[in-house]
Amino acid sequence: MRLAIIIGSVRQGRFGPTAAAWLHARACRRDDLDVDVIDLAEAWLPTVLPAGFPARGVTGPPAVEHLRPWLADADAFVIVTPEYNHSFPASLKNAIDWYHEEWRGKPVAFVAYGEASGGLRAVEQLHPVFGALDAVCVGEPVSLPFHRIPPDSSAERLLDALEKHHRDRQR
């Protein structure tokens, strides 16, 4: 299964790359996963979408088209998101909105971080967003309150849930 780990924050000093590296290291131990890390801070997606976009057959700006095959080729996603002001970052919503077919029917899981809530309020708000795109939110989110890295078993449960959904979808 090809897994894309998406770092959703572009803020300087963010914890997202640390959380993504933790998950990536655990995912790479498995022989059932090919893993890509997509850092939205390096994607440089435009923040203004044209009216009616995304529409089938319409080409987006170069940065959007550069990222498209990475998302299209992924079988599953892990969104690494902070909680900012009880929600997820605008950079993540922007990235989600540029694409549609790339999310459809694919499992999405979450690694969230923040203060006391551990980012869970951000995840709560992401569920209906991905639901509207016909993606399937799976597994319990991995929560990192106060930026504390959890036991490896948390990553294993998350990856197992994604792999199971992917396997069931193939049948």
Feature annotation, model-predicted:
Residues 85-86, 117:
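Glycine-rich nucleotide phosphate-binding loop and flanking beta-alpha elements
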